[in-house]
């Protein structure tokens, strides 16, 4: 494993560097005392360890912050898991966004036990520029047209941030100028908080993680076709249903409840996926937790997703984040907290490779990842597809959702409701159903 890390992970020189905070900003500095043994650790689970024991270990390892005095990443090779091993990787988000990190991790894998690299990394041969380490330059350089306009609007928000957020009517006045981007800015500025549930609150340091058994991707696609929805619609409606069932089991009210999720949107061209850095936007997706009818809930998720297509929210958020990066840290923290307080969860869906991969001679049976949270966001939802299967994972704050496995275990049941509904469809049917009739036909509300 250490050999693979040295040959394929550390080829990205940034991973030999640490972030050094200076007054008002931070810079990357090479760790002159770098030692791979500090970052690649070999441990073992006790006894006949399974999923529960590994979830407990991941929850424990994920809590303490990475050492800022060293490059902020770590590999834990865990022996004695289900007769094999597991690899737990922690990488600070300052190095790269999810799309770039997935590309980095896949560059370490092989297409067979003794096969060639599955996704070889061939960095462009050019002389490094002085501004290569500038996060702002990395964000601005590929932008043109609407992206640059988003940066300008983001800069406006940074300059006039307090006025706009404290007096939303000023944001509305901006929208009346006719710009689609400023209209989106008005929506963000006037957006209220989502429903107060046990998924929302100030997170503490202790976390809990859980993941579901994988679903066949072809089956998810078939259900989506039968019901007139996308794979994402199906999966997100199951997430909403599982969260609803969990709240109901806890005795919490669910009527009219909406949980809003921040969804990162990749804005990086695929040909530049090898580059590190963060280049993503954000959209706010509303999950209709208050809907009991699974078919109605599916169509509500679908409509919410459709309303975001073509939205300027992602590029506007990128502009805001990039402009924030050039502003004082106090303003960065304030605006980030404002964005975060309007949501209860971060939700990421990553399309993984659909063929088996090997790492250091061992076949990879499954992949899972978790996303960081900030502000009042206490839940991270992760969906990843790999080798013909799709996996659902959850990370929660121990203080207000100490048992994410109780949410996870309800995910499969919500999917089965949609399977039953699809099976009741006439042969060859594809498209919308009447939610009430469909629900009654399969015996669900």
PLM-predicted stretches and their roles:
Residues 3-377, 381-444:
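Soluble acyl-CoA-dependent acyltransferase catalytic core bearing the H(X)4D motif
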């Amino acid at each position: 494993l250490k050999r693979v890390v040295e040959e394929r992970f550390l080829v990205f020189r940034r991973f030999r560097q640490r972030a050094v905070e200076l007054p008002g900003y931070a810079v990357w500095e090479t760790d002159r005392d770098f030692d791979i043994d500090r970052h690649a650790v070999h441990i073992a689970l006790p006894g006949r360890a399974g999923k529960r024991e590994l979830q407990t270990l991941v929850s424990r390892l994920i809590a303490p912050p990475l050492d800022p005095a060293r490059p902020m990443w770590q590999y834990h090779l865990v022996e004695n898991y289900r007769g094999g091993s597991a690899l737990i990787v922690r990488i600070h988000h300052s190095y790269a966004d999810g799309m770039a990190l997935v590309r980095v991790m896949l560059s370490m894998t092989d297409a067979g036990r003794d096969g060639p690299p599955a996704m070889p990394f061939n960095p462009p041969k050019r002389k490094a520029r002085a501004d290569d380490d500038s996060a702002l330059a990395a964000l601005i350089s590929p932008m043109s047209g609407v992206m640059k306009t988003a940066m300008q609007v983001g800069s406006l928000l940074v300059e006039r941030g307090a006025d706009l957020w404290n007096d939303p009517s000023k944001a509305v006045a901006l929208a009346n100028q006719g710009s689609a981007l400023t209209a989106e800015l008005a929506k963000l500025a006037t957006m209220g908080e989502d429903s107060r549930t046990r998924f929302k609150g100030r997170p503490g340091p202790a976390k809990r993680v859980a993941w579901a058994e994988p679903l066949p991707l072809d089956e998810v696609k078939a259900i989506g076709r039968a019901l007139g929805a996308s794979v994402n619609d199906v999966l997100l409606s199951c997430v909403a249903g599982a969260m609803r069932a969990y709240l109901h089991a806890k005795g919490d009210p669910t009527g009219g409840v909406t949980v809003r999720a921040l969804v990162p949107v990749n804005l990086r061209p695929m040909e530049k996926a090898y580059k590190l850095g963060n280049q993503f936007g954000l959209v706010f997706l509303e999950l209709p937790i208050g809907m009991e009818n699974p078919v109605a809930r599916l169509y509500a998720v679908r409509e919410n997703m459709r309303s975001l297509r073509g939205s300027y929210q992602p590029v506007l958020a990128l502009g805001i984040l990039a402009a924030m990066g050039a502003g004082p840290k106090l303003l960065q923290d304030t605006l980030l907290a404002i964005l975060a307080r309007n949501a209860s969860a971060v939700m990421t869906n990553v399309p993984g490779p659909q063929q088996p991969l090997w790492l250091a001679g061992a076949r990879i049976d499954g992949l899972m990842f978790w996303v960081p949270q900030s502000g009042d966001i206490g839940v991270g939802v992760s969906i990843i597809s790999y080798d013909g299967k799709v996996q659902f994972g959850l990370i929660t704050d121990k203080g207000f959702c100490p048992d994410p496995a109780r949410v996870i275990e309800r995910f499969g049941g919500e999917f089965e409701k949609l399977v039953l509904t699809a099976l009741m469809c006439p042969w060859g049917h594809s498209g919308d159903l009447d939610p009430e009739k469909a629900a009654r036909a399969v015996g669900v509300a």
